[in-house]
């Protein structure tokens, strides 16, 4: 598999993370250092999941394909509901000011957006590809896309305040629902 094919795969795998980062950036003000750290967490998780899928290879494929869509739906849906609830709360403070999110929650969110990359890793196990290089490309693309999403979302969040947090929750739920419905064959 060539570099450009891997790059297209990497960009495709980073789109869910980009959408989540856009929503997260709109809801929570982040300084540049926090943006970089969050982007690195997402990129690292996104790079590790295709490696895990590749290692699992053929034997794990039936098991993974049975639950990946449910895991994404539950993780992203739960996080989305939490964001929507916080977006609807009557508190007057600026939700973007100092909201802190634990490393664990960031990793959990990153994992929720990277489950499809694990399946890609399984597929790459059956192709002529350097999996370490492929994982590095996927991780770097995701790191860049998440940083861009957080920064762009931050610019939008100042305009929309709590509505941005509610909308971000809707985005997470939509991504989780789309993942579930597409894996169940109900949408294309």
UniProtKB/Swiss-Prot annotation:
InterPro entries (UniProt xref) = Mntp/YtaF (IPR003810), Put_MntP (IPR022929)
The cellular location(s) given in this protein's UniProt record come to: Cell inner membrane
Q: Which domain of life is it from?
A: Bacteria
Q: How does it sit in the membrane?
A: Multi-pass membrane protein
One GO cellular component term noted in the UniProt record for this chain: plasma membrane
TM ranges are 3-23, 35-55, 63-83, 107-127, 131-151, 167-187
Instruction: Note the Pfam families from the entry.
Output: Mntp (PF02659)
Q: Which GO terms describe its molecular function?
A: manganese ion transmembrane transporter activity
Q: Which keywords accompany this UniProt record?
A: Cell inner membrane, Cell membrane, Ion transport, Manganese, Membrane, Transmembrane, Transmembrane helix, Transport
Q: Which family does it belong to?
A: Belongs to the MntP (TC 9.B.29) family.
Q: What does this protein do?
A: Probably functions as a manganese efflux pump.
The protein in question is named: Putative manganese efflux pump MntP
Q: Which organism is it from?
A: Neisseria meningitidis serogroup A / serotype 4A (strain DSM 15465 / Z2491)
- What gene is this protein a product of? mntP
């Amino acid at each position: 598999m060539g570099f450009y094919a891997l790059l297209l795969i990497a960009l495709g795998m980073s789109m869910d993370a980009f959408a989540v980062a856009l929503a997260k950036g709109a809801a929570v003000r982040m300084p540049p250092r926090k943006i970089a750290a969050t982007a690195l967490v997402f990129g690292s998780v996104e790079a590790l999941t295709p490696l895990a899928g590749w290692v699992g290879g053929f034997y794990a494929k039936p098991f993974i394909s049975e639950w990946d869509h449910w895991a994404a739906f539950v993780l992203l849906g739960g996080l989305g509901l939490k964001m929507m609830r916080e977006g609807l709360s009557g508190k007057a403070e600026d939700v973007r000011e100092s909201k802190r999110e634990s490393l664990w929650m960031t990793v959990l969110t990153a994992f929720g957006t990277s489950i499809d990359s694990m399946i890609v890793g399984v597929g790459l196990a059956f192709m002529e590809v350097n999996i370490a290089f492929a994982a590095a490309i996927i991780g770097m693309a995701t790191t860049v896309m998440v940083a861009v999403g957080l920064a762009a979302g931050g610019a939008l969040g100042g305009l929309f305040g709590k509505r941005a947090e509610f909308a971000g929750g809707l985005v997470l739920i939509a991504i989780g629902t789309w993942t579930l419905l597409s894996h169940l064959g109900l949408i294309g």
